[in-house]
Swiss-Prot record:
Belongs to the DEFL family. It is found in: Secreted. The keyword Transcription does not apply. This is Defensin-like protein 313. GO terms for cellular component: extracellular region. It comes from the Eukaryota. Disulfide bonds join 34-63, 45-74, 49-76. One of its GO terms (biological process) is killing of cells of another organism. Residues 1-32 form the signal peptide. The keyword Transport does not apply. Keywords: Antimicrobial, Disulfide bond, Fungicide, Plant defense, Secreted, Signal.
Amino acid sequence: MESKRSSSSPLLILITTIMIIFIISGPKSVDADCKHPVGPYTDSCFTDCVSGKYGYNYESAFCSRDETGTCKICCCELINE
């Protein structure tokens, strides 16, 4: 008795491959509005913002990214602004 091997449809394989590539590469995210850019991004961006280095005790910080996803600008922020 010969067993037939089930073959996946080429379309299913193509869709799965595209989904895997999308998940690995990640979607291009749009950064939040940077209302308080304070300079180039550094590892101490968050600490500098919340410690008052820039003249105000901000509540949080994030980096604004370029089109390649690299952090470029340190953005301090007030949560309820």
